Amino acid sequence: MACKVKWPFFTIGALGLGTLAFAGPIGKFLMTIKLLQPYQFRRIEAWLNPESDPTDKGFQVLQGLYAIGSGGLVGQGLGESIQKLGFLPESQNDMIFAIICEELGLFGAVSIILIFLFMIYRFMLIANNAPDLFGALLVVGVMGHIAIQVILNIAVVTNTIPNTGITLPFISYGGTSVLFLLMEMGIVLSVSNQIKLEK
């Protein structure tokens, strides 16, 4: 018998992600009551207004936005990015989504997002049909980890939140990150393998 995960668990996670929408007002509030250190204040200020310091604090964000903007609808072409040639710092890690937008355009970026959404949908199906609660919770944990990484990376690249240094799962360069993601996928596939199909 399948373990039917109650979807209110997912709504709690969605509410947690919804608090990201209030990151700006919360940051301004913390600055006004002096809870932030000066370097933290400068980082948030560079996030809110990257044009105020375009050669230092706002450089990476602005170059990422230039890459996204220069991609247009269909992009420059695969491998034809200009920003990855030293203009955009960490273009292979934190800012890989900006390079995807530049090379593949809006259609490529939307395709990547749709692939991640489909993966998350499949995680939900596996969690919903898992044979026991433990397996369902394992899958929900992996799903949450990957979903949060995707949301944070894309939000940083589009300057929706301050820079966090989070990589884009399965796409960003990095040995340890990919290793742990593959281990997590192995856990999910193990739970999926235990699901009994109805005949």
Name every feature range the model reports, one short phrase each.
Residues 1-6, 22-23, 117-127, 188-195:
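Structural signal for the C-terminal ends of transmembrane alpha-helices
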Residues 2-16:
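Membrane-interfacial entry segments at the cytosolic side of transmembrane helices
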Residues 13-109, 133-134:
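Hydrophobic, glycine- and aromatic-enriched re-entrant/interface helices and adjoining loop segments
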Residues 13-18, 110-118, 182, 186:
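Generic alpha-helical transmembrane segments of integral inner-membrane proteins
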Residues 30-31, 124-131, 164, 195-199:
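Membrane-interfacial segments
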Residues 87, 99-102, 142-146, 174:
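Transmembrane helix-bundle signature of multi-pass membrane transporters/permeases
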